[in-house]
């Protein structure tokens, strides 16, 4: 893992955006990463936010690596969020 990008274990379900949000620290600055419940269901199954959070936690390393690649590609949306597909 790139030491300039760190992922604290502070993921949470965002009911408004219907996604799991998780922070990334990029050279000391916080950035928000997210993956939708729909995407988690497609990738790993699950029908509820609790199941999607559990799937996120189970597959954390792979998802963080994917987020790291998107951050390095500067794939932020207009709100500054990085969305995993």
From Swiss-Prot:
Matches recorded under SUPFAM superfamilies: Shew3726-like (SSF160272)
One Pfam assignment: DUF1488
Gene3D superfamilies according to UniProt: Shew3726-like (3.30.160.140)
InterPro entries (UniProt xref): DUF1488, Shew3726-like_sf
Domain of life: Bacteria
Protein name: Uncharacterized protein YrdB
Organism (species): Escherichia coli (strain K12)
């Amino acid at each position: 893992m790139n030491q300039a990008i760190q992922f604290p274990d502070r993921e949470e379900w965002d009911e408004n955006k219907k996604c799991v949000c998780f922070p990334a620290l990029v050279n000391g600055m916080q950035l928000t990463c997210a993956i939708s419940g729909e995407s988690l269901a497609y990738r790993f199954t699950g029908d509820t936010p609790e199941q999607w959070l559990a799937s996120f936690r189970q597959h954390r390393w792979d998802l963080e690596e994917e987020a790291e690649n998107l951050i390095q590609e500067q794939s932020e949306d207009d709100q500054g969020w990085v969305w995993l597909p």
